[in-house]
Design a protein with these regions (language model features):
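C-terminal, active-site-flanking charged/polar segments
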Residues: 1-5, 163
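Conserved helicase NTPase catalytic core signature
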Residues: 4-139, 152-153
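Conserved helicase motor core of SF1/SF2 NTP-dependent helicases
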Residues: 100-101, 126-139, 146-196
Length: 196
């Protein structure tokens, strides 16, 4: 999935010039901000950061704050540069790129996901947006560690930056084949893993 996310940076956005009441940003300037200034911002939130910069510039040059309607006009111009912001559509690209059948094409309110699609979609969502980061949680306790997959632990690491206590018995898995989560937990959480 990480390789797909890297390729997605070039595939997800069609850069265009933006002009608002005589103030213009070229596609190449927007691209420079997108790929160089805001690289620490998740991909689906990044254009919003570029847009905020443009709005600040417009307000400074015009000497007044823009009203909600004016900001909405600018917002549409920037957000329309995304080919899509639909996580399920992006997941379908991933599936098709790797030779798997796409999810059925349905409106968001009628979508039903298979269990095996839930965690990859959540991984994409938390990789592409800042949604769901739980910064106010100080400690997380996870029980039955043996029943979580590698991807589920990666998601937990993305969602929670706090300390964690992970409990379980690797010999009591509900999965068909036994996995030793202790082999991959240090890769996900780094050297912060202590085994008791």
């Amino acid at each position: 999935i990480e390789g797909f996310l890297i390729e997605l940076e070039d595939r997800l956005v069609d850069f265009e010039d933006v002009e608002f009441k005589g103030i213009r940003k070229s596609a190449s300037e927007i691209m420079e901000f997108f790929y160089e200034k805001y690289t620490g911002t998740p991909l689906l939130d990044r254009m919003g950061a570029v847009m905020d910069y443009f709005i600040d510039e417009v307000e400074t040059l015009r000497g007044r704050s823009l009203n909600d309607e004016e900001q909405e006009i600018i917002c549409r111009k920037f957000m329309n540069m995304y080919v899509t912001r639909d996580i399920c559509q992006i997941y379908n690209w991933f599936l098709e790129d790797y030779g798997f059948p796409a999810l059925p094409d349905m409106p968001p309110e009628r979508r039903v996901l298979e269990y095996e699609d839930v965690y990859p979609i959540l991984y994409l969502k938390y990789s592409l947006t800042a949604a769901g980061q739980r910064k106010n949680i100080r400690h997380l306790v996870i029980d039955e560690m043996q029943d979580y997959s590698y991807l589920q632990y990666v998601l937990l690491a993305k969602m929670f930056s706090c300390n964690m206590t992970i409990l379980g018995d690797k010999a009591q898995t509900i999965a068909g084949k036994q996995q030793d989560v202790l082999t991959f937990l240090p890769k996900i959480f780094g050297k912060k893993v202590k085994r008791i």
